[in-house]
């Protein structure tokens, strides 16, 4: 066979013409040291704060420290295989997470990756995790109620859409229960809920998800979980991931609720990262910017102006106290950032007062303007009456003979405490709360309280049976309150007549 030189050269030319190798250019550095998920990297001179890096095995990292000759980065994933001298690449990207309706009903990790075994999210939109909170001009004052379904909160420390209300208390006082009841109560209210679990046991998160599924609340809820076994960077980032997902609904003119359970553990994770990055420690060994850690997160909850779509994002951060100490560093920080706090007390919890809300310390700085008129009408004096009762009860234990007026006040106070008791996973619509509080605070034609003759231990049963009776015989009363959101003379007349009728039916046991 004859080899022709011109044919060979033509084939070579054709092959060269079609050959196109893309050269990947990336700034690469090497790891100087790696300990507990924090790496120091040499050679990434162009890296920016908050930029994502790529470690061996496809693990991502986040730049936190920029120093003269190295950068400090938090590794967001398993780091046991990463060694000194390993190469690290810049990605040029800032951390972003999937957002949108596709996330409803899903459980994701601190970076928005699905962990519920139901396949990919297929989200159409992504957003950067760290963005600035809306300015003053874009906001509107809080004026719409965000009902929790709990009488003690909706009557005494009301929450409005766009508010930030702190829930704090010792461990095992029912903080998560208050948050979960709020989610359950808003079924059918077009409120999209986000539950961020930080540093919790995976079994606890699974139990919360099961509860939400059982009551049909997972349809409008997303769970973001950075569990106790996840690296500290994931626990630090999870709240920002959650708020970014919730902001999507706020910015599209809808209403969202986010629960951070709990921010004490996020602060501990951030302290761990900061100490490993050798940042100077401050009070309780927290870094100097731990206030900014929480303020920039909670400022993203807002009620937007009509021009911006009138959407809202309500935040319920949870803080765990140690032995009821609200004057510790993190609790005081978050109290000063939020618009009020609900303080849960272990003593009340053990006495059977649940939810165990200390009405004296709990406040809502802006929620009053969001409370419906009907609730203001019936619960106006409730807080004062309870405060007087607590004061008298403290003195009464020292004295044996009390005058009749004091005995009356104590008896009434005991019934009011019973009136505000409520079981878990049993939130009440606001119109039914108004009816129960009306029965507990208003007087009948004889000038006596409606529940004056009911023994204290039977008040809870009285309230339950009263609602059952009204639902069966007089359903129009609750409907009228729900529509008018106020108690006019007609509703009062109907309610008094129904209460008189119920008084003849209710049987006192024992």
Curated annotation (Swiss-Prot):
Record's function text: Produces ATP from ADP in the presence of a proton gradient across the membrane. The alpha chain is a regulatory subunit.
Subcellular localization, as worded in the UniProt entry: Cell inner membrane
Quaternary structure note: F-type ATPases have 2 components, CF(1) - the catalytic core - and CF(0) - the membrane proton channel. CF(1) has five subunits: alpha(3), beta(3), gamma(1), delta(1), epsilon(1). CF(0) has three main subunits: a(1), b(2) and c(9-12). The alpha and beta chains form an alternating ring which encloses part of the gamma chain. CF(1) is attached to CF(0) by a central stalk formed by the gamma and epsilon chains, while a peripheral stalk is formed by the delta and b chains.
Protein family: Belongs to the ATPase alpha/beta chains family.
Native source organism of the sequence: Anaeromyxobacter sp. (strain K)
Binding site for ATP: 169-176
One cellular-component annotation, GO: plasma membrane
HAMAP family: ATP_synth_alpha_bact
Membrane topology: Peripheral membrane protein
InterPro entries: ATP_synth_asu-like_sf, ATP_synth_asu_C, ATP_synth_asu_C_sf, ATP_synth_F1_a_nt-bd_dom, ATP_synth_F1_asu, ATPase_a/bsu_AS, ATPase_F1/V1/A1_a/bsu_N, ATPase_F1/V1/A1_a/bsu_N_sf
Annotated site residues (Required for activity) in this chain: 362
Record EC number: 7.1.2.2
EC class (word): translocase
Catalysed reactions, as listed in the record: ATP + H2O + 4 H(+)(in) = ADP + phosphate + 5 H(+)(out)
Repeat recorded as keyword: no
Coiled-coil annotated residue ranges, if any: none
Gene designation per UniProt: atpA
Annotated protein name in UniProt: ATP synthase subunit alpha
Key words of the record: ATP synthesis, ATP-binding, Cell inner membrane, Cell membrane, CF(1), Hydrogen ion transport, Ion transport, Membrane, Nucleotide-binding, Translocase, Transport
GO molecular-function terms, A-Z: ADP binding; ATP binding; proton-transporting ATP synthase activity, rotational mechanism
